[in-house]
Amino acid sequence: MQLKAFSVSEVTEYIKKVMDNDIILRNVRVRGEISNLKYHSTAVYFTLKDEGAALKCVMFNDYSRSLEFTLQDGMSVIATGRITVYEKGGLYQLYVQSVQMDGIGALYIAFNKLKEKLQKEGLFDLDKKKPIPKHPRKIAVVTSPTGAVIRDIITISRRRNPTVDIMVVPVLVQGSSAADEISNALRILNKRKDIDVIIVARGGGSLEEIWPFNEEKVARSIFASRIPVVSAVGHETDFTIADFVADLRAPTPSAAAELVVPDIKVYQRELFLLKTKIMNLMKAQVLHSKKEFEGLKRALYLNNPIKKNEVLKQRVKNLKKSLTKEMLSIFNQKKNELLVLNEKLDSLSPLKVLTRGYTIVLNKEGQVITSSRKVKTSEEVGILFSDGRATAVVKEVKEDGERI
């Protein structure tokens, strides 16, 4: 008996009916590693593989938009959907309706692989961290517009310094679109000139929920930002790739507000100390200037020509008085000395002897004849008396012992 020959379409249609009616294949969960991941306008195409086989998969956008994370090659996942035949290609494939990561271990593997990659590229280097401004005027907060995170940041910021402007940039913080929204927000903010610092924040959650902050595109957007970025994701013990790339990591969103927004009380205290310092400097300067002024005033007074003239006049007067007194003293002293000398001279004067009856004999030259040997006979001599003189002629000269 000859078997009936079926057309390709008939066989394919039969296989499709069998698979579509299979209770297991209509709703099946398949574990495998993603490969050959491709995004198209209407769907995401990839292959699930393990050590022994491979399964083509397609996930239409209506389903992929609800993903809590972004699909990546090498990621271990569990895909849920229905397996049927794609008739035109003659292929059976899994039409995926949902995808979940295959355990926390797979996420940690992906986390560590990306961390190692970015670290080798230098995205975590400390010397590439930008300093957080000490006195920001405007802070952009990239986070969900609702919930405790943004409320806490705004409350703490207003309490610490109400003059700081907080700009809320609303984005999804979980789901497959979150990474794109966060990256776009950072790119747009970097076009502005009025933003001093950016806080990227979300509250705590599971590793799957905070996974957008472990996405490579978010990490690279943070690194490329010219504006300093502070990451504040999850709880204190949660670490994301964003934390390593950011210029500063805050343990919580509330802590980010504490770290970035300066306390106005500190401003006021610093202002008071600065004011006190300025006042002390001014007082010291005034005191110094006053001393200098007094010194200049005194110097001007002493160097004043009129004052100098008065001083000189007084000095001349004092010198004149002193000189007169000194001269009078010297005059009296010399006068007394002269009187004493005069008395001595008078007592020794030959004329004084004449008053006692003696005479002095003089030769023609008026010289005193002190010896008989100095006179000759017939020589004319002068005789000096106390009250006059006379002329005589020597008649005879005798030596001592001879009588005249």
Curated annotation (Swiss-Prot):
GO biological process: DNA catabolic process
Gene Ontology molecular function terms on file: exodeoxyribonuclease VII activity; nucleic acid binding
Pfam families found in the cross-reference section: Exonuc_VII_L, tRNA_anti_2
Annotated compartments: Cytoplasm
Coiled coil: none
The EC number(s) this enzyme carries: 3.1.11.6
InterPro entries: Exonuc_VII_L (IPR003753), Exonuc_VII_lsu_C (IPR020579), OB-fold_nuc-bd_dom (IPR025824)
Reaction(s) catalysed (UniProt annotation): Exonucleolytic cleavage in either 5'- to 3'- or 3'- to 5'-direction to yield nucleoside 5'-phosphates
One annotated Gene Ontology cellular component of this protein: exodeoxyribonuclease VII complex
Keywords: Cytoplasm, Exonuclease, Hydrolase, Nuclease
Subunit (UniProt): Heterooligomer composed of large and small subunits.
Function: Bidirectionally degrades single-stranded DNA into large acid-insoluble oligonucleotides, which are then degraded further into small acid-soluble oligonucleotides.
Record-linked PANTHER family: EXODEOXYRIBONUCLEASE 7 LARGE SUBUNIT
Family: Belongs to the XseA family.
Name under which the protein is recorded: Exodeoxyribonuclease 7 large subunit
Source organism of this protein record: Caldanaerobacter subterraneus subsp. tengcongensis (strain DSM 15242 / JCM 11007 / NBRC 100824 / MB4)
Organismal lineage: Bacteria, Bacillati, Bacillota, Clostridia, Thermoanaerobacterales
Gene this chain is encoded by: xseA
